[in-house]
Amino acid sequence: MALYILDDPGLSVQLPAKTRTEIGALRALNRHRIPSRPVGLADIDTLAEDPQAVLLLPQFHAVPEAVIRRCEQQAIPVIVLHTPGSSFPALHFSSVCGHAHSDADALLRYCAAAGRQRLALFAFNAVSAVDRSRAQAIADRATALQPEDLFAAVDSFEASFARFYPHRQQYDAILFANDYAAIAFIEAMQAADPTYLAGRFLIGAADTLLSRLYHTTVTTITYHRRDLLRGVATVHRTLLRDRGSVVSLQYQLPAAIAVRQSTQHFPLPPEAAPLPGSGGSTRLRFPEQGFFYEQDPVLGRIMATEDQLCAMDRTELQILLHFLQGDTNRHTAEALYISDQALLYHTRRMFRRAGVADKQTFIRFFARYVSPAHLTAYLHTHACAGI
């Protein structure tokens, strides 16, 4: 009855730090309810030898679709985290993920409790099914939202910001497709109109590492890890019990909001707080064209910073903190109780991943988006998280 967790260095996508922590927590279930084993891409076919095998994919876009199809051919149930099966009707897999309308309800309840009713949806990628479903779910729930309140990313983030800027005073809350867009917006608005951010709500999505470490921490829509673990355990148990009769299950994670500085730490409303009236089914007009965030010079730079942070272990995050604080190499090594050779090893790895040749360039690379105070708090909070 093992749960096989795909863990392969050949995965095409760097898993976020949060996802890697979740995988560690899932493996810890081995001591309680679910025996778990890591498995590589080359070993997928061997799972057929276990009549009770279930494969867990930590991220849909990290693996080829052929892996899911191969498991389907061999009657091996597949669970995918954070990707609804309805997004890929040609594939059969179970999912444990959030739901766009649940997220929309939580966001609108939060904004309404704070008296923020004039909403804008910013930097929603026209070619992203996730962005489109999230934006439409908000439009379905919000009373006053109109198609012109959607500022979709068509050609570049800067162009989207330029379209938004003349209308900025019309809104008291801006909801973003992800934390990267929220961070880019804060940076651009601080340069263009520093007083604008005070009193307004800016809410991202996905709870990235940068949302906690940026100079202005970003409130984000997310979920609780305990709900994810409960969801995986429930789906796994059901697939084993009804193996052969169940093709796929969809477990919906309850929405949660991580409240941070971009909403001035405004407290969450009571669960019983009423929602705004339904907006019916306002159809948002996404432009035909679109671009990928990775290709945008602004969003791509922020995503690259996130990737670099996710690739760092705890020692390297501590080294980064000391460097951002202006400490010398000698002081850094002494403070972390590591040798000069160990410090050199880690810094070379960090420089190579960041594509820089020296310490000062490395510091400039991260100082733009990482607050030493917030990194200190993160390291303290996650002292036992294995990061």
Model-derived features: where do they sit?
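Flexible loop/turn connectors
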Residues: 18-20, 24-29, 90-93, 169-170, ...
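Regulatory hinge/linker segments at domain boundaries
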Residues: 273, 293-315
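Alpha-helical recognition/docking segments in bacterial nutrient-uptake
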Residues: 1-109
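Hydrophobic alpha-helical segments within soluble ligand-binding/sensing domains
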Residues: 1, 85, 91-121, 157-162, ...
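Short alpha-helical "packing" element that flanks the helix-turn-helix/winged-helix DNA-binding module
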Residues: 316-323, 350
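Recognition helix of helix-turn-helix DNA-binding domains
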Residues: 326-361
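Hydrophobic alpha-helical
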Residues: 25, 40-79, 107, 111, ...
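Short, basic, alpha-helical segments at the C-terminal edge of helix-turn-helix-like DNA-binding modules
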Residues: 356-372
